[in-house]
Amino acid sequence: MKNFISLLIAIGLTLIGITASAESNWVTDYEKARVAAKVGKKLMLLDFTGSDWCGWCMKLDKEVFSTPEFQNYASRNLILVKLDFPRKRPQTEALKNQNEQLAQKYGIQGFPTIIVLNSQGEKVGELGYTDGGPSPFLAKLETLPKS
């Protein structure tokens, strides 16, 4: 029984680590991300989401963004920016204002909406939920101009 409990604890800690590492690739500060994209010559992926209430957003996170395939691709090619509109999770006023201004700038009307910018900050694509896991989503990203 003691070994079983130890095993459950180890599995739980591993899962927490996987979730934390997937989340750690996302930033919330748009300006810092913009500079990083420019310096790194990477695309910027803006994820407009309702993380704690939007079913399609949660599905996109689970089926695409949290997968090793997407994480590996993103680490080489993307600066990931989470622009969240939660209903239950608290946010600072500065973060709320930033997210609302960006949603207005890009004409966001529903969630999830993914806006892709090139390293110069120009919009090169717009995506939503894509069925089939990370491969079809990454295939769509690959068709977008890089500069």
Regions found by a protein language model. Give the residues of each.
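A short beta-strand-turn-helix
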Residues: 26-44, 74
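Bacterial N-terminal signal peptides
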Residues: 8-16
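Non-catalytic, surface beta->alpha helical segment in thiol-disulfide oxidoreductase systems
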Residues: 63, 101-147
